[in-house]
From Swiss-Prot:
Stated role: DNA-dependent RNA polymerase catalyzes the transcription of DNA into RNA using the four ribonucleoside triphosphates as substrates.
Subunit annotation: Homodimer. The RNAP catalytic core consists of 2 alpha, 1 beta, 1 beta' and 1 omega subunit. When a sigma factor is associated with the core the holoenzyme is formed, which can initiate transcription.
CDD domains assigned: RNAP_alpha_NTD
Protein's name in the database: DNA-directed RNA polymerase subunit alpha
Keyword Transcription: yes
Listed Gene3D superfamilies: 5' to 3' exonuclease, C-terminal subdomain, DNA-directed RNA polymerase, insert domain, RNA polymerase, RBP11-like subunit
SUPFAM superfamilies in alphabetical order: C-terminal domain of RNA polymerase alpha subunit, Insert subdomain of RNA polymerase alpha subunit, RBP11-like subunits of RNA polymerase
Reactions it catalyzes: RNA(n) + a ribonucleoside 5'-triphosphate = RNA(n+1) + diphosphate
Pfam families to which the protein is assigned, alphabetical: RNA_pol_A_bac, RNA_pol_A_CTD, RNA_pol_L
GO terms under cellular component: cytoplasm; DNA-directed RNA polymerase complex
GO molecular function: DNA binding; DNA-directed RNA polymerase activity; protein dimerization activity
Gene from which this protein is expressed: rpoA
Length: 330
């Protein structure tokens, strides 16, 4: 059954943008869609984007987080609290984790920037953050492990990275998003004033541009919703190949190829010719070559041109092998 057309934006307007803040506008939206889209994007942005954070530390002479370090003003608990705030940006793609050993001496302060001096694959984004204060003669040896993750992970779940009894797991704040706000306002389309405008503000730690963060959040939502829209996808299989995996492009193509031709804007003549040949969906149509179609009863070049224009507008073409999309799989 054809879906009635929705009033929706044809593009996203970026009102403001730099490396840490972006303001975006979506308009027009159907009544009620502002809060639906805004809330979904906000939750995904805050909870589901990937980032990098410290997962474990080891300090010479320290056995647990309730200890203190000789010559250091802060106890280990406060040192950990400060280390949790250090933000990292990946600068070498091959590096998804890194472990460094740092010696702090002849300094009254240990800052986040001191960690950056030892790193190869990452950049510290807040180098002025003070981790702890030291006496003039104090020395501290600390090992730090950085890993890739998503959202927030408590210390207990980071115990898998502990390779020694004196290694201390810490809470990891992976999310690169600092804050997300959205507002829904009325918007006028011609004579109707009950449409909506969604304004979304995204603040990041600088490891990802707000525009890219928005795109990643949208991809996550699209991927999950596409699973609901394809009733033929099964998550479990008795085949020896095990579970099937579908990327976003395959999911999109499956949905597109299952579209019925009667729902497309085709002439009655073309539809009747195709129906007589049992060609009912886009998937049926794209399997034919142009010469095959011209053999259909009452099918002429005008109808062929009409179908050719339709497929071109959908980035499809005649003579396509659709076997990899498994349209007949139950």
């Amino acid at each position: 059954m054809a879906i009635l057309a929705f009033q929706k934006p044809d593009k996203v307007l970026m009102l403001e943008a730099d490396s840490r803040f972006g303001k975006f506008e979506f308009r027009p939206l159907e009544p009620g869609f502002g809060i639906t889209v805004g809330n979904a994007l906000r939750r995904i942005l805050l909870s589901s984007l990937e980032g990098f954070a410290i997962t474990t530390i080891r300090i010479d002479g320290v056995e647990h987080e309730f200890s203190s370090v000789p010559g250091v003003k802060e106890d280990v608990t406060n040192i950990i609290l400060n280390l949790k705030q250090v933000r990292f940006k990946q600068v070498v793609e091959e590096f998804e984790s890194e472990k460094v050993s740092i010696t702090v001496e002849n300094s009254s302060e240990f800052k986040a920037g001191d960690i950056g001096k030892y790193l190869t694959g990452f950049e510290v984004l807040n180098p002025e953050l003070v981790i702890c204060h030291l006496d003039s003669k104090a020395t501290m040896q600390i090992d730090i492990t950085i890993n890739k993750g998503r959202g927030y992970v408590p210390a207990d779940e980071n115990r898998e990275y502990c390779t020694d009894v004196n290694v201390i797991p810490i809470d990891s704040i992976y999310t690169p998003i600092r804050n997300v706000k959205y507002a829904v306002e009325n918007f006028r389309v011609e004579q109707k004033t009950d449409y909506e405008k969604l304004v979304l503000e995204i603040s990041t730690d600088g490891s990802i541009h707000p525009k890219e963060a928005l795109k990643e959040a949208a991809k996550i939502l699209i991927y999950h919703f596409m699973l609901f829209s394809d009733e033929k996808i099964t998550l479990e299989s008795n085949d020896t190949d095990g579970n099937e995996e579908f990327d976003e492009e395959v999911l999109h193509m499956r949905q597109l190829l299952k579209t019925k031709l009667v729902d497309m804007d085709l002439s009655v003549r073309a539809l009747n010719c195709l129906k007589a040949a049992d060609v009912e969906t886009l998937g049926d149509l794209v399997q034919f070559n142009k010469t095959d179609l011209l053999k259909f009863r009452n099918f002429g070049k005008k109808s062929l041109t009409e179908l050719d224009d339709l497929l071109e507008s959908l980035n499809l073409s005649f003579g396509t092998d659709i076997s990899k999309y498994k349209l007949d799989k139950e």
